[in-house]
Amino acid sequence: MLNPQLNRHGELIHLLSTEGLPRRIIEQILDLAATFVPAPGQEFPKLPLLHGKSVFNLFFENSTRTRTTFEIAAKRLSADVVNLNIAASSTSKGESLLDTIANLSAMQAGLFVVRHGASGAPYLIAQHVAPHVHVINAGDGRHAHPTQALLDMYTIRHHKGDFNQLTVAIVGDVLHSRVARSDIHALTTLGVPEVRVVAPATLLPEGLAQMGVRVCTDMEEGLRDADVVIMLRLQNERMRGALLPSAHEYFKHYGLTQARLALARPDAIVMHPGPMNRGVEIASEVADSGQAVILDQVTFGIAVRMAAMSLVAGVRP
């Protein structure tokens, strides 16, 4: 079966999911991102790699970190950046998604960065754009968030060196999390020997065992001797029905406190894709501790998105 993210030469042309993404492509992105990370105290480099290309940010769902870091990344690559105001666009007047894309393509769009509430929307767009136009998935429904997973992989590699002896615990609302799915695919592709998914039974999707992960409903069991702890927020906006008694009850059993973090390895790092809800999935004392690398994720996200845009466009320094 053909991989819609690659051309016939095996080169990246769209970034839609970490599922099925070859290890060599993931490592290419991480290695290229490393060349973009500025030295401490310096700014991100300004490079002409996307000079003359137009990058359209199409965010049909709200975003702060992802949209902003994509915009910064594109500008650092000298692209012309267009942020479409979805609420004021023709899509709010009934225009179809593909008609919107066709009209923007006629404006010489070179790259679409798409966040959409419908799983599969970026795939649909990628199937209908011209060969010289590229698509990056910035999050689609519950399905995938590949650049978040890639920046997570970069952060882990930066702090831990390699992946082949790590235990990684992903904790929280896995049922509704596109980040969890994308992280799992990336971690297993990169050879992490033990990936644990930790959540109450009501927030665990079916089929996790087939993804090669260990499922834990007990927080202490899931955290024990972990090298990396990735916390996920409760996605109340996607929940249907009473999946949890209360946020207070959730924190009581699944919130990451200093006492629970002590079950992990002493040098364990704590990550979070944001937005972070203190006192719900993570205690402030942990979020503000030296083990938390959450702001590193944001910084590295710019470099990783620079690398992703460069590779799909077929350019590099």
From Swiss-Prot:
It comes from the Bacteria. Carbamoyl phosphate binds at residues 65-66, 115, 145, 148, 274-275. One of its GO terms (biological process) is 'de novo' pyrimidine nucleobase biosynthetic process. InterPro entries: Asp/Orn_carbamoyltranf_P-bd, Asp/Orn_carbamoylTrfase, Asp/Orn_carbamoylTrfase_sf, Asp_carbamoyltransf, Asp_carbamoyltransf_Asp/Orn-bd. GO terms for cellular component: cytosol. L-aspartate binds at residues 93, 178, 233. Keywords: Pyrimidine biosynthesis, Transferase. Pathway: Pyrimidine metabolism; UMP biosynthesis via de novo pathway; (S)-dihydroorotate from bicarbonate: step 2/3. SUPFAM superfamilies: Aspartate/ornithine carbamoyltransferase (SSF53671). GO terms for molecular function: amino acid binding; aspartate carbamoyltransferase activity. Signal peptide: none annotated. It catalyses: carbamoyl phosphate + L-aspartate = N-carbamoyl-L-aspartate + phosphate + H(+). Its EC number is 2.1.3.2. Catalyzes the condensation of carbamoyl phosphate and aspartate to form carbamoyl aspartate and inorganic phosphate, the committed step in the de novo pyrimidine nucleotide biosynthesis pathway. Heterododecamer (2C3:3R2) of six catalytic PyrB chains organized as two trimers (C3), and six regulatory PyrI chains organized as three dimers (R2). Belongs to the aspartate/ornithine carbamoyltransferase superfamily. ATCase family. This is Aspartate carbamoyltransferase catalytic subunit. It comes from Bordetella parapertussis (strain 12822 / ATCC BAA-587 / NCTC 13253). The gene is pyrB.
